[in-house]
């Protein structure tokens, strides 16, 4: 059978159309099957409490079949777990260095948290409440203290977790130096005094989504990373 030029054109386009339909069906099947699974995410306490729920909720609205396993720990421990491939990715507070890719997701300002307004010049004579935090956060706050008061921070009462420190502050037992999320003052009725550098700028701590550089990731993890880049990333 010999086709006319018009018939040959239609036959060629019909073949292309069938191949297109086949590719679309395969793509939809792959998309559906690969975007089912569990993502193991590390997150420090404060990010989990104030930010992570909203991030996961927004992502879950688009991807109903994805489950999450959340590992709560300090950022330095989470960063090590990422480097050692114990978790696929994690949110870490502070600028940790290593063989990773990272996405800036939050910048938190530092404050002195107290029951009542304070005079910064009298701060060294006041009761300090310390708590468990990561090394990078401590380094930033300790450096500010040394630059401001000329000596190391005093050893204060140790509260363990930061939320217990806030509760002790609320009882008037001292002050705490913390990086706080937006909206903190709506949850805790405490006095916040901004911690500023010599130029009057806020002391900032970065929070990153971190994952191993060059590692082959599943489509589920890659999709979550893309969601963070498209919806959460702070572009400096």
Task: Name every feature range the model reports, one short phrase each.
Residues 97-110, 185-197:
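Ligand-binding "clamshell"
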Residues 38-42, 90, 129-130, 176, ...:
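Short, well-ordered beta-strand segments
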Residues 2-30:
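Alpha-helical "hinge/linker" immediately C-terminal to small N-terminal DNA-binding modules
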Residues 74-75, 83, 150-196, 202:
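Hydrophobic hinge/microswitch elements
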Residues 36-97, 158-159:
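Central regulatory/effector-binding core of bacterial HTH transcription factors
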Residues 127-151, 217-221, 225, 235:
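Secondary-structure junction motif
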Residues 195-236:
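A late-sequence structural motif
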Residues 98-140, 204-214, 229:
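Hydrophobic/proline-rich hinge and linker segments of small-molecule sensing/allosteric domains
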């Amino acid at each position: 059978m010999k086709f006319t030029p018009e018939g040959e054109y239609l036959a060629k386009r019909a073949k292309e159309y069938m191949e297109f339909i086949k590719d679309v069906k395969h793509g939809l099947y792959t998309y559906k099957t690969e975007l089912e699974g569990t993502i193991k995410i590390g997150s420090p306490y404060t990010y989990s409490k104030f930010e992570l729920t909203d991030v996961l909720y927004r992502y879950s609205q688009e991807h109903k079949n994805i489950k999450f396993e959340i590992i709560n720990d300090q950022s330095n421990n989470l960063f090590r777990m990422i480097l050692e491939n114990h978790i696929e990715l994690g949110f870490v507070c502070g600028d940790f260095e290593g063989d990773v890719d990272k996405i800036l997701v939050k910048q938190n300002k530092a404050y002195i948290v107290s029951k009542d307004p304070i005079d910064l010049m009298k701060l060294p004579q006041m009761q300090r409440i310390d708590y468990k935090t990561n090394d990078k956060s401590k380094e930033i706050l300790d450096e500010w203290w040394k630059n401001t008061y000329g000596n190391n921070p005093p050893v204060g009462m140790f509260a363990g977790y930061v939320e217990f420190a806030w509760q002790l502050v609320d009882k008037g037992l001292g002050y705490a130096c913390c990086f706080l999320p937006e909206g903190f003052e709506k949850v805790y009725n405490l006095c916040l005094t901004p911690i500023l550098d010599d130029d009057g700028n806020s002391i900032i701590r970065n929070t990153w989504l971190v994952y191993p550089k060059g590692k082959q990731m599943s489509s589920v993890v890659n999709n979550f990373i893309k969601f963070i880049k498209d919806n959460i990333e702070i572009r400096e």
